């Protein structure tokens, strides 16, 4: 039990009430590793990062690590980098992956260092959920309906007889045009006007939108 373990660790040193309370608390953290409270903490962890509260994010990371769980926060961090930061700071995904790899190689307690770095980065980064909205819109659009064939000019033309079937013959190679762009249809006819990605107002996405608006305005 807790008292026996404390007695073995403290030896002849007097055990204080706060020592017992701390030991019981840490034991309860480990016991609840897969309980409802654990998933509440995981939920609060992601929502705190999404809400850009760096201190709350570190608090919940600490509670997860003290429970002995390293894999759950790692999975959440990888998701958050794409779901909640996303196109506002695309480099976050590779930086977080590097931190995660370091944490897995180091193990606890040193793993807390790269994980804290990843949490601080994500919590303080600009946010965008344009990526998840875009892919979910695309998936919803194709669910339960025929969207049509790939346009002929985009079809594979690397086999004998392809040209006779008009496959790939009208394709325009974008790199042969100014700004590496040429206007041509890429979506199937049935959904040729579909729009899935809507850039959000952060600095990075705004700069991309400005660039492409300028390139495409005279096409």
Locations of regions flagged by a protein language model:
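Inter-lobe coupling/hinge segments of SF2-like helicase ATPases
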Residues: 14-18, 27-39, 53
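Short, exposed beta-strand "edge-strand" segments with a Pro/Gly-rich flavor and a Y/T-containing core
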Residues: 9-15, 145-149
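Charged, low-complexity surface segments at secondary-structure and domain boundaries
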Residues: 4-10, 30, 193-197
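Short amphipathic alpha-helical boundary/capping segments
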Residues: 30-34, 46-50, 103-105
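C-terminal helical "lid" of AAA+/P-loop NTPase domains
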Residues: 1-11, 18-25, 43-47, 58-63, ...
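Terminal-proximal interaction/regulatory segments of ATP-powered molecular machines
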Residues: 51-181, 188-219
């Amino acid at each position: 039990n807790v008292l026996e373990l404390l007695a073995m660790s403290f030896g002849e040193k007097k055990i204080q009430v706060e020592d017992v309370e701390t030991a019981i608390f840490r034991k309860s953290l480990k016991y609840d590793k897969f309980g409802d409270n654990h998933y509440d903490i995981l939920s609060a962890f992601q929502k705190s990062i999404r809400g850009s509260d760096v201190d709350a994010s570190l608090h919940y990371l600490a509670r997860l690590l003290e429970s002995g769980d390293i894999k759950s926060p790692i999975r959440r961090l990888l998701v958050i980098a794409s779901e909640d930061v996303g196109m506002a700071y695309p480099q976050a995904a590779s930086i977080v992956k590097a931190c995660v790899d370091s944490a897995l190689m180091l193990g606890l307690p040193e793993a807390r260092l790269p994980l804290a770095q990843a949490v601080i980065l994500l919590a303080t980064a600009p946010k965008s959920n344009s990526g998840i909205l875009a892919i979910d819109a695309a998936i919803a659009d194709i669910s339960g309906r025929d969207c049509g064939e790939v346009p002929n000019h985009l079809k594979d033309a690397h086999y004998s007889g392809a040209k006779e079937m008009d496959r790939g013959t009208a394709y325009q190679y974008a790199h042969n045009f100014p700004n590496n762009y040429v206007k041509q249809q890429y979506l199937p006819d049935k959904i040729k006007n579909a729009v899935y990605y809507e850039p959000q107002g952060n600095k990075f996405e705004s700069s991309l939108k400005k660039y492409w608006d300028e390139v495409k305005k005279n096409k």
